[in-house]
Amino acid sequence: RFDSIAMKENIALSMADVLTFNSSVFVKNYGRATLSTVAFRGTSPSHTQVTWNGMRINNPMLGMTDFSTIPSYFIDDASLLHGTSSVNETGGGLGGLVKLSTAPANHKGFGLQYVQGIGSFSTFDEFLRLTYGDKHWQSSTRVVYSSSPNDYKYRNRDKKENIYDEDKNIIGSYYPTERNRSGAYKDMHVLQEIYYNTGEGDRFGLNAWYI
């Protein structure tokens, strides 16, 4: 089970980054806003089951989960179950289980939280949470929005430029430095949760997650 402090300290990261820094599982990450998969030792990503509030969220076609699309800001509790220890939770997890869950707001009245992160290449991450709670009802709305032109400079070694003298003779060559023009991305996630406590020990919940 992940330490709650570690989860709070990494709210600006995806769950792929949280697993990389705080667990022994193998995370294959192709960069920001690209595919990130998780595999337990000796197995493939399709052997890793992922649940959110008890519901399996593996891709039904590929059998794996892209953890870059899961903001850690949306997760209140996370734990890992290795190998056959995951059978009690869900079947089909030969490698193991990544168990994710959210929790209702534990305070009464309205609450508002806003966090912004700024990175290189004009990268912006914005996090917003609006909560409300009373004796019977709890509501939570979380929004994550990330954007970046991702226009870093690189040396294009597929494009060689020649250097000419006054007589148009080639006297040298070089690889030009260009700026990436096709790496821009915008990513938005919305999580809406509504809970109702009957006051008799039962609680009903309705959760909706837009990826």
Spans of model-derived segments:
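Transmembrane beta-barrel architecture of outer-membrane proteins
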Residues: 10, 14, 35, 65, ...
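Extracytoplasmic beta-strand/coil segments of soluble accessory domains associated
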Residues: 16-59
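Short beta-strands and strand-coil junctions in structured, solvent-facing domains, enriched
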Residues: 47, 57-58, 84-88, 148
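Short strand-turn segments of transmembrane beta-barrel domains in outer membranes
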Residues: 77-79, 87, 97, 102-132, ...
